[in-house]
Amino acid sequence: MTRIKINARRIFSLLIPFFFFTSVHAEQTAAPATPVTVEAKNKTFAPQHPDQYLSWKATSEQSERVDALAEDPRLVILWAGYPFSRDYNKPRGHAFAVTDVRETLRTGAPKNAEDGPLPMACWSCKSPDVARLIQKDGEDGYFHGKWARGGPEIVNNLGCADCHNTASPEFAKGKPELTLSRPYAARAMEAIGKPFEKAGRFDQQSMVCGQCHVEYYFDGKNKAVKFPWDDGMKVENMEQYYDKIAFSDWTNSLSKTPMLKAQHPEYETWTAGIHGKNNVTCIDCHMPKVQNAEGKLYTDHKIGNPFDNFAQTCANCHTQDKAALQKVVAERKQSINDLKIKVEDQLVHAHFEAKAALDAGATEAEMKPIQDDIRHAQWRWDLAIASHGIHMHAPEEGLRMLGTAMDKAADARTKLARLLATKGITHEIQIPDISTKEKAQQAIGLNMEQIKAEKQDFIKTVIPQWEEQARKNGLLSQ
């Protein structure tokens, strides 16, 4: 305490001349300081943070692409009419953030800045260039327009300035200086009573991850990113919020249901689980302190599976050995996956049965309660499985959400059976062969050969133009 008082007196003594000067020369008001431009080139910070930089760069080793649609073709039906039915890979290293959003079939094959299916907001979790553009153009300026408009500007992979105040003197000295670089994330945290500036160090460590590893939607004409937390963070709270504002991400092309697509709600599910409730942060498990060759501790930025650094992560709290904990996690994962598949089977049938009812002349009023059940069932299923780590973060909450999803899907199918009977249809509705991704995509009418050909042309012609322009503008490290 004495040390704090001495520092305070010293600072005050240094400020006295400043106060005196401004009182005498009040008319000479200083111009506001120009904000320091966000530096998006991650390599810039390698000299001050060499270990962190090299470990971040090592996320390029996490290069495997896992096709989730090939593993589970039911997803194609659930997302019929939405870009996810074309292409959905499981996540890989941060070093591929820009590459993957460019190359996914979901972003289409735009020919110019005004072309393509998706908005600028789809860049928002991919690069520190997003923070740079928001600072430069404001949020409205950044979000305005199509995704392709950002191609020549958003070129550096998710990195330093996404989570750190890289312009601060403290960061230059090797301190972390965490920050929320996305203003919409800061507002969302305030909405749940967690203003970043007042949060403790452990809360802040998870909040910076929660800028991206969250559920969000595109709000208003400008398609700005917003987190649906106004009514709370549980699946029912967000469902209520979306229903209240009559929001939908798309309409399923089979059942004509206005649907919700969950993104990657790790922050919400972590908060609901035992680790979140005990403030065991994302950093504790995914970015542990490790030693470099000289024995100096640093935060490992090769974000990955905690079991890969068991001694520095799990073993800090748990007395069980690695094999025992892996067995527990595997069992939880299997339980969640088993229920996930059962819910998906019910939803696949519900979408095709709803299509049959519509084809038989069912009215909008007759379909409304059924579509509400389908919407809510699939939303709860999606929020449970879109967080790939829910079996670790909150297995009980995952099973609970899937259980309520199963109930809602069953309600929809019961109502559909009654409605179909009134239309003279009492036989079972046949489901086409969806045993592979390709067959499922054919069943919903996707011309995948054309979609893939257009994408390959885009990759070969448009992306090189973006990169050339970025280099000319000094946005990429040479």
Swiss-Prot record:
Needed co-factor(s): Ca(2+); heme c
Subcellular location field: Periplasm
CDD domains reported for this sequence: NrfA-like
Residues that coordinate or bind heme c 2: 160, 163-164, 301
Pathway: Nitrogen metabolism; nitrate reduction (assimilation)
Residues engaged in binding heme: 122, 125-126
Residues bound to heme c 5: 275, 314, 317-318
Catalysed reactions, as listed in the record: 6 Fe(III)-[cytochrome c] + NH4(+) + 2 H2O = 6 Fe(II)-[cytochrome c] + nitrite + 8 H(+)
InterPro entries per the UniProt record, alphabetical: Cyt_c552 (IPR003321), Cyt_c_NO2Rdtase_formate-dep (IPR017570), Multihaem_cyt_sf (IPR036280)
Enzyme Commission number(s) of this protein: 1.7.2.2
GO (cellular component) term, any one: outer membrane-bounded periplasmic space
Residues bound to heme c 4: 282, 285-286, 393
GO biological process annotation, one example: nitrate assimilation
Record keywords: Calcium, Electron transport, Heme, Iron, Metal-binding, Oxidoreductase, Periplasm, Signal, Transport
Binding residues for heme c 3: 94, 209, 212-213
Record: residues binding Ca(2+): 215-216, 261, 263
Pfam families cross-referenced by the UniProt entry: Cytochrom_C552
Family annotation (PANTHER family): CYTOCHROME C-552 (PTHR30633:SF0), CYTOCHROME C-552 RESPIRATORY NITRITE REDUCTASE (PTHR30633)
Family membership: Belongs to the cytochrome c-552 family.
NCBIfam families per UniProt: cyto_c552_HCOOH (TIGR03152), PRK11125.1 (NF008339)
Protein name as catalogued: Cytochrome c-552
Gene: nrfA
